[in-house]
Swiss-Prot record:
Protein's name according to its UniProt entry: Phosphoglucosamine mutase
Co-factor binding comment: Binds 1 Mg(2+) ion per subunit.
PROSITE patterns noted in UniProt: PGM_PMM
Residues holding Mg(2+): 102, 240, 242, 244
Top-level taxon: Bacteria
InterPro entries named in the record: A-D-PHexomutase_a/b/a-I, A-D-PHexomutase_a/b/a-I/II/III, A-D-PHexomutase_a/b/a-II, A-D-PHexomutase_a/b/a-III, A-D-PHexomutase_C, A-D-PHexomutase_C_sf, A-D-PHexomutase_CS, Alpha-D-phosphohexomutase_SF
Class in the EC hierarchy, top level: isomerase
Processing and modification events after translation: Activated by phosphorylation.
Annotated Pfam families: PGM_PMM_I, PGM_PMM_II, PGM_PMM_III, PGM_PMM_IV
Cited Gene3D superfamilies: Alpha-D-Glucose-1,6-Bisphosphate, subunit A, domain 3 (3.40.120.10), Alpha-D-phosphohexomutase, C-terminal domain (3.30.310.50)
Organism of origin: Mycobacterium marinum (strain ATCC BAA-535 / M)
EC number: 5.4.2.10
């Protein structure tokens, strides 16, 4: 058996790679790990999911695994991933389980596990759980020692009270289009923005289990651009299937990506004295324009590998207060233990109201260098990335770019893809060099 955990939990096509049997085994193994690492007593796990069709099957299997090992399951239903992380701490649960494949297509699903306080697991803990999956079920409690299932009726309201802390001023007079991706934010997202005072126009907020992320949300911005322009809205915010991401569109329909959002929020926090150590944490995928904008403002930038778990690790290690990814995962540890798209949207709108500036004006503090990202599907990520022909193509591109740009070659942690990213002084060069390297990867993969 290969490694189960990727960069963001366990993922696969539901009922093919991610089966009910595997979900049950993961639930049981997580419960066993908890029993071996803590003292005696009744244990509780928060369990949530996004609305994709396979979620109910996997939820039932995970809960069966947990309860078979004596852990009570606190079922919160369809809620965003950051809600499950928050509620794990708010309910003083021993751990949390989120069933979601985030921005992936509907047939996929995933299982993400949070430790105490809603923090993501480290590699050693994931390895321990994997070893317990391989070993099979442990001792089975009987009678009153079997875990129970409890429905947390107040879960959504508790989460909404939490995210309201992100909004330090009323948003009255602001019109926002919210794209919920037919996902986990479909109910709580519009409620959160309306509670803050904004006029909300919601789109793609009618999940039926089959339409999550289907040409909508943060990976398909055409609909929200059109809606912002049609309604004359001040901005649009787009979430993904589990609402841990937020991308924005300004009143002109132009994209404000995670890099630009981080610049806006970093400057706001610096001004308020809330940017710890005057430092922003981001990944190697962030545009060079972010680094230049932060240098001009006197903000340090700490760079990590790709994946919000690495951003989170650096935030915790340095006790920093803001980090994120270009993809829209924005983390503010003072407001949550993981990326929260709704919190990000509220903070962005708060800055607009506080300054009286448009989103376009705020985002203009960062000048984006042309960046081209090509996803290349391969059968063997490691072999393709290491192929001599690919390395030669990368070397040629780096020689041409010199100090005026950069190239990154990165295997996806969740999909059979290698991502080729090139930044250059002009778009033609970025496209040409990215295509050249992508062709080499495709031929090798």
């Amino acid at each position: 058996m290969g490694r189960l955990f990727g960069t963001d939990g366990v993922r696969g096509v539901a009922n093919r790679e991610l089966t009910a049997e595997l979900a049950l085994a993961l639930g049981a193994a997580t419960a066993q790990h908890l029993a071996s690492s803590t003292g005696p007593g009744r244990r509780v796990a928060v369990v949530g999911r996004d609305p994709r069709a396979s979620g109910e099957m996997l939820e039932a299997a995970v809960i069966a695994g947990l309860t078979s090992q004596g852990v009570d399951a606190l079922r919160v239903g369809v809620l965003p991933t950051p809600a499950v992380a928050y509620l794990t701490g708010a309910y003083d649960a021993d751990f949390g389980v989120m069933i979601s494949a985030s921005h992936n297509p509907m047939p996929d699903n995933g299982i993400k596990i949070f430790g105490p306080g809603g923090h993501k697991l480290d590699d050693a803990t994931e390895d321990r759980i994997e070893s317990l999956v391989a070993a099979g079920p442990g001792l089975r409690p009987v009678g009153s020692e079997i875990g129970r299932v409890i429905d947390a009726e107040d879960a959504a309201d508790r989460y909404l009270r939490h995210v309201s802390k992100a909004c330090t001023t009323r948003l009255d007079g602001l019109t926002v289009v919210v794209d919920c991706a037919h996902g986990a934010a479909s109910e709580v997202g519009p409620r959160a923005y309306r509670a803050a005072g904004a006029r909300v126009i919601e789109i793609n907020a009618d999940p039926n289990g089959l339409n999550i992320n289907d040409d909508c949300g943060s990976t398909h911005l055409e609909a929200i651009r059109a809606a912002v322009l049609a309604h004359g809205a001040d901005l649009g915010v787009a979430h993904d299937g589990d609402a841990d991401r937020c991308l924005a569109v300004d009143a002109n329909g132009d994209l404000v990506d995670g890099d630009a959002i981080m610049v806006v929020l970093a400057l706001a926090m610096q001004e308020a004295g809330e940017l710890a150590s005057d430092t922003l944490v981001t990944t190697v995928m962030s545009n060079l324009g972010l680094h230049l904008a932060m240098r001009e403002a006197g903000v340090n930038v700490r760079t990590t590998g790709v994946g919000d778990r690495y951003v989170l690790e650096e935030l915790r290690a340095g006790d920093y207060s803001l980090g994120g990814e270009q993809s829209g995962h924005i983390v503010m540890p003072g407001l949550g233990s993981t990326g929260d798209g709704i919190v990000t949207g509220l903070r962005l709108m708060t800055r607009m109201v506080a300054t009286g500036a448009s989103l376009a004006a705020l985002a203009s503090r960062m000048q984006t260098l042309p960046q081209v990202l090509i996803n290349v599907q391969v059968t063997d990520k490691a072999a393709a990335a290491a192929a001599p022909s690919v390395q030669a193509a990368v070397d040629r591109a780096e020689t041409e770019l010199g100090d005026t740009g950069r190239i990154l070659l990165r295997p996806s942690g969740t999909e059979p893809l290698i991502r080729v990213m090139v930044e250059a002084a002009d778009e033609e060069a970025a496209h040409r060099l990215a295509t050249s390297v992508a062709d080499a990867v495709s031929a090798a993969g």
